[in-house]
UniProtKB/Swiss-Prot annotation:
Catalytic activity: Endonucleolytic cleavage to 5'-phosphooligonucleotide end-products
Family matches, as CDD domains: AP2Ec
Protein name per the record: Probable endonuclease 4
Gene3D superfamilies tied to this protein: Divalent-metal-dependent TIM barrel enzymes
InterPro entries the UniProt entry points to: AP_endonuc_2, AP_endonuc_F2_Zn_BS, Xyl_isomerase-like_sf, Xyl_isomerase-like_TIM-brl
Coiled-coil residue windows: none
EC number: 3.1.21.2
Gene that produces this protein: nfo
Annotated Zn(2+) 3 binding sites: H182, D229, H231
Source species, domain of life: Bacteria
Cofactor(s) for this UniProt protein: Zn(2+)
Chain positions recorded as Zn(2+) 2 binding sites: E145, D179, H216, E261
Species of origin: Yersinia enterocolitica serotype O:8 / biotype 1B (strain NCTC 13174 / 8081)
Family: Belongs to the AP endonuclease 2 family.
Length: 281
């Protein structure tokens, strides 16, 4: 079973994200559980939590179909202790919000060394940050997203993801989300079926498909191996549609959220319908 959707707005309350996903005829969705550009947010009120859970039940979404994303401000590999602590506290808060909403996944960008510490130290800090968050929460899996490798962001190599997982004590609560645009921009080609076989073969060998908890399905405005993160609508960018059809046919991508973060929300329903049609061919 393929779960396909988009990262929808939670404006007006997290329950509104569920309704928006349903209106797209999505079978999965992503959301922010708070303003992603602020450090702090008011705690989730009981009535808000209840409305969200009721909406999920009404429209048939389980936690396996929902991939919340944390704040972009968080850097779990920050080289400066005070800033690292601030990020860790914010990440625990994000995990707790997911826990309150009955969600089982939290997607996040791993972190950046800011040219102040080496890659190895930064990756170890990220793993330690995850361990601290897992100790402080229950039932939520930390889902590390691969990056395009802009600036000093880590996570652009599958080896980075594997190194972080290696440092996490509870392997049952850590996973990865692969963004097709980020992978392409980081030098993992996806333009042909042979490219897909090679790239996903490497993912299986280096990270392991047992850790795959979600996908972000994005075409790329950015060039191959450019280390630039610029999303595009499916089939309109430099990757093309082959990989998205490939994913919809491959059972290794079953039963996880497959989430659009493409640039034109007006055609999300169309893109979701096209992806579903590929699964049926």
């Amino acid at each position: 079973m393929k779960f396909v959707g988009a990262h929808v707005s939670a404006a007006g309350g997290v329950d509104q994200a569920v309704i928006r996903a349903h209106e797209l005829e999505a079978t999965a969705f992503a959301l922010f559980t708070k303003n992603q550009r602020q450090w702090r947010a008011a705690p989730l009120a009981e009535d808000v939590i209840e409305k969200f859970k009721q909406a999920c039940e009404q429209y048939g979404y389980t936690s396996a179909q929902i991939l919340p994303h944390d704040s972009y401000l968080i850097n779990l590999g920050h080289p400066v202790t005070e800033a690292l602590e601030k990020s860790r506290e914010a990440f625990i808060d994000e995990m707790l919000r997911c826990q309150q909403l009955g969600l089982s996944l939290l997607n996040f960008h791993p972190g950046s060394h800011l040219l102040q510490i080496d890659e190895g130290k930064c990756l170890a800090r990220i793993a330690e940050s995850i361990n601290i968050a897992l100790d402080a929460t229950e039932g939520v899996t930390a889902v590390i997203e691969n990056t395009a490798g802009q600036g000093s962001n880590l996570g652009f190599k599958f080896e980075h993801l594997a190194a972080i997982i290696d440092g996490v004590e509870d392997k049952s609560r850590v996973g990865v989300c692969i963004d097709t645009c980020h992978a392409f921009a980081a030098g993992y080609d996806l333009r042909t079926e042979a490219d897909c076989q090679h790239t996903f073969g490497a993912l299986g060998d280096i990270v392991g498909f047992e850790y795959l908890r979600g996908m972000h399905l994005n075409d790329a405005k950015s060039e191959f191996n450019s280390r630039v993160d610029r999303h595009h609508s499916l089939g309109e960018g430099n990757i093309g549609k082959t990989v998205f059809s490939y994913i919809m046919h491959d059972p290794r991508f079953d039963n996880i959220p497959l989430i659009l973060e493409t640039v034109n929300p007006d055609i999300w329903a169309e893109e979701i319908a096209w992806l579903k049609s590929q699964a049926e061919i």
